[in-house]
């Protein structure tokens, strides 16, 4: 798949050395020429971004960034001055956080699969070694374009079609303790939009309720949940979202009401297209839990067969231990 880069620029934000370190911004005075190397870099950044855990946001009414972006989209300003303004705002916001270290600031407007995007990222540089033409070893620096966590992307096509959308802005969820998400929300003056985790949990509840109102037996309910999981798994593998209408077509109609109609009538508040969350969807076909030094995970269809739950006595009986577990127990008895 190819990517079409329309405008791209790089700026530098670096930390000064000394007792009171500060962030300095070095602004490029022209856009990068679009070359095969530039498009290859952006394709790698795009692919890396696709694989990362992301959150959704929307601009606040008073967002200065959104105002600047609107001026760009209305052709009241050019991409270069827009990027200068963004770099200065980013540097100012980044200076408030203890993890501030700077990097290469990338802004790129590109098209992928008939969708226009604005990609913004702060990429770290890494040090490595190379062997030159004289077979001498020298130190070199390179952009770490696969391992980055300060980035956001705006779906310009979605924003243009539906300004009230709650999913046109995405940003990478930060690692624990680094508050990257908070930083980018402040930089963009944005707030939480679509919550994929909540949407997935609501979807699972709707599936359970749908089976209950259809008065399905336990095996029938497990079969429906398995169908839901297989559909969602296929969407994850293909990089697609869960389409409620497609999912509904894959499920049986119960009491003359299909699944999509059921969710609308019961007002679950589900989006027509839902970003799948793998860990949440696993509960469709698996039971798992941990506590007090014990971790248990098993396929749902084994409950009542190889695993017997006694709710009254709070016990779970396993019939037929896994061979490796049995061997460990035998060796250490």
UniProtKB/Swiss-Prot annotation:
Gene Ontology MF term list: double-stranded DNA binding; single-stranded RNA binding
Highest taxon of the lineage: Bacteria
Main location: cytoplasm
Keyword Cytoplasm attached: yes
Keyword line: Cytoplasm
Keyword DNA damage: no
GO CC terms in record: bacterial nucleoid; cytoplasm
Protein localization: Cytoplasm, Nucleoid
Family: Belongs to the YejK family.
NCBIfam families tied to this protein: PRK00378.1 (NF001557)
Protein name (record): Nucleoid-associated protein APL_0429
Lineage, top ranks: Bacteria, Pseudomonadati, Pseudomonadota, Gammaproteobacteria, Pasteurellales
């Amino acid at each position: 798949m190819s990517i079409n880069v329309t405008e791209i620029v790089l700026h530098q934000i670096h930390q000064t050395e000394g007792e009171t370190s500060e962030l300095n911004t070095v602004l490029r005075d022209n856009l990068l020429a679009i070359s095969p190397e530039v498009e290859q870099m952006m394709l790698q950044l795009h692919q890396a971004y696709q694989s990362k855990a992301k959150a959704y946001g929307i601009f606040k009414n008073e967002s200065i960034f959104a105002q600047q972006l609107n001026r760009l989209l209305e052709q009241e300003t050019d991409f270069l001055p827009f990027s200068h303004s963004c770099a200065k705002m980013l540097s100012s916001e980044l200076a408030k956080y203890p993890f501030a270290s700077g990097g290469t600031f990338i802004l790129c407007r590109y098209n992928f699969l008939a969708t226009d995007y604005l990609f913004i990222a702060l990429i770290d540089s890494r040090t490595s070694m190379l062997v030159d033409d004289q077979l001498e070893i020298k130190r070199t620096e390179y952009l770490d374009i696969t391992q980055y966590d300060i980035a956001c992307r705006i779906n310009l096509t979605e924003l243009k079609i539906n300004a009230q959308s709650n999913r046109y802005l995405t940003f990478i969820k930060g690692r624990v303790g680094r508050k990257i998400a908070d930083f980018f929300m402040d930089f963009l003056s944005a707030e939480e939009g679509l919550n994929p985790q909540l949407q997935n949990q609501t979807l699972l509840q709707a599936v359970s309720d749908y089976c209950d109102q259809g008065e399905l037996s336990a095996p029938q309910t497990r079969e429906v949940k398995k169908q839901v999981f297989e559909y969602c798994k296929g969407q994850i593998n293909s990089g697609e979202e869960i389409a409620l209408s497609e999912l509904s077509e894959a499920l049986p109609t119960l009491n003359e009401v299909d699944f999509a109609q059921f969710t609308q009538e019961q007002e679950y508040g589900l989006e027509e297209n839902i970003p799948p969350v793998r860990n949440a969807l696993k509960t469709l076909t698996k039971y798992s839990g941990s506590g007090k030094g014990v971790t248990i995970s098993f396929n749902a269809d084994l409950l009542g067969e190889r695993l017997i739950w006694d709710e009254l006595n709070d016990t779970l009986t396993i019939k037929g231990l896994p061979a490796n577990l049995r061997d460990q127990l035998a060796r250490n008895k």
